[in-house]
Amino acid sequence: RPTSMVFQGFALFPHMSVLENIGYGLKLKSIEKEVIFTKVTKMMDLVGLTGLSKRMPHELSGGQQQRVQLARALILENDVLLLDEPLSALDAQLRKDMCIELKRLQKTVGITFVHVTHNQEEAMSVADRIAIIADGEMLEEGTPEEIYSNPKNKFTAEFIGEKNIFNGTVVSFNTKNITIDIGNDTIEILNQGYKIKKNQKVSLSIKSESIEIIKNQNKSDDKLKVAQIMGTISEITFLGQFIRYLVLLKNGQEIQVRSPKEVKNIKLNDKVSLKWKLEDFLLHQK
């Protein structure tokens, strides 16, 4: 399929104006100057570069240079646009703005965008579907919600979001629950149709925001279908929208808990209970 590409670097011709950069591909196709000018003007309006046709690349901001590169690729009207980490050279806020812009552009032009990135937030915000690729192999694909909330693969669970990973051994199981030994402690999870056997080595994952910190409590709550283990607060960090707690478990593993608000009367070195719903844990056999 005819494909255009947007590179990691801006890759603009420094001796050409914005208009000349965007229209260069059409010029190579021997399109008439009047047609090129009309198409470039429309494309500049589409990507938010109106009035900048005579500017040189060094006179543009990083975001404007990236828009020029996008316009130069889109004006060829190919079936697919391949974007190779296109926002990596931009600062954090500009990346967020460009994610919104890319989403809008894709809906407007209606072609397939293949966006390559290592940035999770970038992928989640621009994609209709996400493919996780490692060592040349596609491990899984799905909607952003599916990939984040229900990863099928241990690598995906570690890579997407802030999840805690536990390695352990299946102690027992029935049609409802599974008990896994993680070393000096056991974790009970909901059996969601997993095909497992006793003494099997498995991995568990749980999102850091799915764990609740409770002080001075050490009992399971069967009525609410929750379970918990004990730990010690090793670090408390304020990160703006949430507070991150690091909790040291008896097996020596340190896990993250993200809370939208401060847990009252909790300080460093306090003994706490970590509480979760049984269904919040996912089991991975690879």
Segments and roles (model prediction):
Residues 2-4, 8-155:
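ABC ATPase nucleotide-binding domains
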Residues 90, 97, 159, 214, ...:
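Residues that scaffold the ATP/ADP-binding catalytic core of kinase and kinase-like folds
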Residues 121, 145, 154, 166, ...:
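Glycine-centered loop/turn positions within well-structured domains
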Residues 150-179, 205, 275:
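C-terminal boundary and immediately downstream tail of ABC-type ATPase nucleotide-binding domains
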Residues 173-286:
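Non-catalytic connector elements of ABC transporters
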